[in-house]
UniProtKB/Swiss-Prot annotation:
This is Elongation factor 4. The gene is lepA. It is found in: Cell inner membrane. The lineage of its organism: Bacteria, Pseudomonadati, Campylobacterota, Epsilonproteobacteria, Campylobacterales. Pfam families: EFG_C, GTP_EFTU, GTP_EFTU_D2, LepA_C. It comes from the Bacteria. Belongs to the TRAFAC class translation factor GTPase superfamily. Classic translation factor GTPase family. LepA subfamily.
Amino acid sequence: MSVKNIRNFSIIAHIDHGKSTLADRIISECGAISDRQMSSQVMDTMDIEKERGITIKAQSVRLNYKFNNENFVLNLIDTPGHVDFSYEVSRSLASCEGALLVVDASQGVEAQTIANVYIALENNLEIIPVINKIDLPNADVEKVKHEIEHIIGIDCKDAICVSAKTGVGIKELIETIITKIPAPKTDDEAPTKALIYDSWFDNYLGALALVRIYEGSIAKNDEVLVMSTDKKHIVQDLFYPHPLSPIKTQSLQSGEVGVVVLGLKTVGDVQVGDTITLVKNKAKEAIGGFEKAKAFVFAGLYPIETDKFEDLRDALDKLKLNDSSITYEPETSLALGFGFRVGFLGLLHMEVIKERLEREFNLDLIATAPTVTYEIYQTDGEFIKIQNPSELPPVNKIDHIKEPYVKATIITPSEFLGNLITLLNRKRGVQVKMDYITPERVLLEYDVPLNEIVMDFYDKLKSLTKGYASFDYEPIEFRVGDLVKLDIKVAGENVDALSIIVPNEKAQSKGRELVSAMKEIVPRQLFEVAIQASIGNKIIARETVKSMGKNVTAKCYGGDITRKRKLLEKQKEGKKRMKAIGKVNLPQEAFLSVLKID
């Protein structure tokens, strides 16, 4: 196949704007799968992707299409749409020459679309605006065209209107891809460079790398080098990606997309964004932009049954084979026993991983409240980073603390603007920009501490705006904050898993909210249980769970009052002893109550 007949493109869209359905339509229009074989969402392979309607891993498919009596190869590179996976998006887009910008005709441009379009523009991709779901009764094509032009600045007079559901406009869209998106620029004589834009683990073949060949070529049995690790491997097999079963090939030429089998044991050896080159004709430098995926959000994961600790370790090891962005290390908690402090790309990533651990490995887990990384500058000049509030040094040893900030982009119907600004101010947000896209919709940009977002910001945003606002964030920098550690004591015992780091001015109110929430959850005992919130040694709030009364005088019929008094005194003594040594078992809701406070 001549390089001039290859088109590499991806689809950019917000969740629920019909990206996976459109991909399926393009695949069936090109005849890669018969209608009978078509399962909805061919590109989404994980059950959890289909259930949540999201794309987590980038998938690819090679399609053949005849146009003007010439055969063309279309490589459709599917990208995740969610903010947590934006690094995977950037690598997928770097493998393309063009992108379809898909916008729902009834909903308009959303926040996550903007972030991904900017990545595409940075990579100088040819962008084709596609307005989807034109079959819906409330579709407003002209309004959506205006929004795309106003927010993103792309001319929409030639936008393609399609309905992925009914198939309207799909043929015209494929022909536009061929005529508008340029062929790959290649140099067959240059040393081989291949960009890994996805990798996953196969039980039979080991770690597989999905690559786009930029320069040169790779053939079966070649000795290749992974540039960031400097490790050498032999190419055992090469495939073209196909939705049903991959097609074997002897070589991959520049401009092509394919799967490379190197017989590796873990995906950590072929990380997304890395470069593969040949040992005999080594490239001088790697393709730019490679970063190791960084964890932003951390949470403790503990098995409810303490003897399942090793099972949890095995499960995390297996997930790590397929997702090199997870980080984890063992930790112990006085309240919860042995577990792991796990790092995630973001909140959705955390939910997906916890759900996969429970579903695929049959584990019952307690997750502590999510936290972020803090930079602690100590009075003795030492500098440390912590992810667990219980690691915070004593107050007298801290000079100052820095916390991570993110740039939050929100698009909301203007009727909810007042409520949203109140929420953002309460979350310590700083307004950077406010722009009316149309009289009914507003674009907001705020700098917000990441810690305020990981708790429950997304849920509150959705409930305040009846689900109409969309939200995206990207990390910017660490800034100094006036922060303190809030500890919770139950029956005099410090519950380390409930410690949180909060702004000083909110500590009092958060402490009060937390102890009153805990009071509702902690089960009543035969003795009184004090729940206290403290900063250092200072108690700032307290609630008491009253004891259950046992009627010790029930067996005294009538009789002497002194007899009853004696029994009551004895009970009082017993309760005193019990209180001193009593242990309170906290339910999972207690650990989640931290998330519910505002």
